[in-house]
Amino acid sequence: EGFVKKIGVSLYNYGQIDCILGNYSIDLVQLPVNILDQRLLDSGHLKTLKKYNVEIHARSVFLQGLLLMQISDIPSWFNPIKGVLNVFHKEAKKRRISTLQLALSFVQSIDEIDKVVVGVNTLEQLHQIIEVMPLKVNIRDFSSLSISDKNFLNPSNWRI
């Protein structure tokens, strides 16, 4: 006894959230949330999870690094959403912050998010994230950047 403090699940969509909440008592969830993928925010599922006192960890904050790539380096497969990516880059530039800081600040500004999970490939990337984490950016409504096409929101669907 006492070996497990919290039980959690890693989920992908609100259908899974509904299923889990209807059948199990959990302490935390790990979910994809980023400035392009606002589905769980828009659907009210983040608020629902909080009503059940579930801790929420956001993952895919940088959408597998897509949000951090230079526009010129983004593969042509993403052409249908390049307009949205351009607006995202322009918003960061207008605010004089990096795309990393804007992407991270957006997720950190969501009241229901308790923790942010990030992945890095290098020590330099980790240092960059640590450097911008405490910086607070005044985030306005970025619903105009929200997309719903799962082909672009779920990296397992990417054809690159």
Regions found by a protein language model. Give the residues of each.
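Beta/alpha (TIM)-barrel catalytic core signal, keyed to glycine-rich beta->alpha loops juxtaposed to Asp/Glu
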Residues: 1-147, 159
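Structured alpha/beta or helical-core interaction and ligand-binding surfaces enriched in interleaved
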Residues: 151-153
